[in-house]
Structure formats: C-alpha cells, structure tokens
Amino acid sequence: MTFSMLRSAVAIGICACLYTTSVDAQLDPLTVQIQPLAQSSLLLDIANAGDNLVAVGQRGNVLLYKNEQWQQVATPVITHLTKVFFFDDLNGWAVGHDATIIHTKDGGETWSVQMQSTKIEKPFMDIRFYSENDGIAVGAYGLFYRTADGGKTWTNEFHQELLFEEDIGYLNDLKAEDEALYLSERAALLPHFNRLIRLADSRLLLVGELGMVAVSDDNGQTFTKVDFGYEGSMFNAIQVADSIYVMGLRGNVFKSDLSLSDWQQVDLPVESSINGALVTQNNDLYLVGNAGIVLSIDDTKAEIITRRQGENIVAIAKDSKGQLWFAGSKGLFQLN
C-alpha cells in the first residue's frame, strides 16, 4: 500500500469549499449577473494591487477595493477562485477549480482566461510569478504548471522528487508493466501543493499535505524536501525577517531560521487550523484560521486578538491606509 492511500479526508482551509467542484461550473459565465451579496459570500483570498485590494472566492467572484469601497467586477469564469497574486500594481493572476487561471492587466478591473480544463478536475491552490513572464501555479495532487511567457502558455510538470520513496519504487515497477495505469496512478500520488512563496533570498518554499515542506534554489525546477518532524497538512508559509513560519492543520505552527533545519513549534492557545498569514512592515505577524480565530505572533508566543464564532477566516491583507481586512466563509470584514 502506498502512503498516498493512507490520506485522511481532511480538506484544507475551510474544507469542502476548496476541493469540491461548483455545481454551477457548467453555466455560461456570460449569463451570470453580478451578485449583490458577493461581499458577504465565501471569499478565499485577498491581495494588494497597488493602493487597492482584490478579493476572490466562490462562483468566480472578484471584488475590487478602490476609493474605500468594495465593488464586484465581471469575470469570465464561475468556478471557485482560491488564490490571487499581483506581480505589480497592474498585472495579476487568480487561480481556482477546474485548473483555472485568469489574468488582469489593469489592476483587477477586467480579467481574461489563460487556462481552464474541466478534464483536469483539480483545483489550483496558489500562483506565484518571479518575473513579468515567469510563473508557477500549484494545486491538488501535485498539480504544477509553469509559464515563461506571462501565462500565454502553461506547461505541466511532474516533480517525482516530492514523492515518498515507496511511491517512487511503486511507480517505476508500474511503468514497466502498464503505461496507462502508471500515468493514472501518477496523477494521484503527489500530495496537495497548498502554498508557494518566494523567500527574500529568491528561494521558493512549497508547503502542502502530509507535512510536506520543500525548498528550491532554481526557480522550482527541482525541490528538496525538508524534514521538520510533522506529518499533518501545511496550508501556508511566510517569512518574517530572518525566520520562516509554516502553518496548518489543528493549529500546528512551526518556526525556523533561514537554514530550514532548526524548527521550533509555536504553541497556540487554540487548535483551529491556520489558513492565512500577514506580516507588516514592522514585522508584526498575524495568523487567521478556522473558528474565526485571529492571532498575533511574537517570536514563538501567540495571543488571541479575536474569535468570531460560526465562520472560518482564510485570508488577511492590509489596505493602503494600514487597515486590516479579513476574508472567509462569510465574506469580507474588518475588526471593530
């Protein structure tokens, strides 16, 4: 039996919202009207776009925060969008279900499809560009696509170095016996890739399911797995000065120096899964998670800022005036 067969049914972040395909995926997006309640619907990420903010979520919803107001903008998709990233003030990408990638060249005002495939049946969970043309999108079951032309074309990659040793041997044996079955099995053996970040020294850090933390010093061409003694899912990662934090299931948060070899667990006063993180210019670190939890972190000490019952918080961002915004299962909000 391979390690992948032992996976639990735990979904990341806010559970099924991220991994189930929308019932409306077969609808024509041109027939879907702007939703008046989009700001209070499921939203899964927020990103800064110059002086503005852009939030993404269910049914292809994209909201733009401009002139201190949130306004929904039209998009060409109605699949769930899980992550949004801006390389500069104008150029941004959002990813989501059905291997969807959409692109904006005007700060989030308008969007076009760069990639989408219902045949892939996997969601992208993150996207990262390290130049105007070069970027990577990652997602469930090892989904990994690369572009070298700003997203005009995307190429699939399989990173065997991130498999368990047992699975590598299993695939090698299977490939010699049945090529079709080999390709089918290969598509489901890698863990979910949940977050990809670029460190200050230009290395890429990838975190995901089954305690996967991996680092690359060649822009994601190859990765080296990092062993930090935990086998639960990691949902996010962030750099704070000379420290790296990874976070995930049931309130598990770990901190290391830049060597990624000296990990300490950060004791949280909660067991809620941690989904999102933000570091300010003053190196203040905030974490958000399930059960409406918002935490501030000082080195390895954690303090609860608030707990909002009945909702899950997935993302946090700061606007141009320094105000914090949160996104999650009940949409966008600020703390009073």
Predicted regions located by residue number:
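Bacterial N-terminal signal peptides that target proteins for export
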Residues: M1-V10
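Hydrophobic helical h-region of N-terminal Sec-dependent signal peptides
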Residues: A11-C15
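N-terminal signal peptide c-region/cleavage motif recognized by signal peptidases
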Residues: T20-S22
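Residue-level hotspots at or immediately adjacent to binding/recognition sites across diverse folds
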Residues: A25-N336
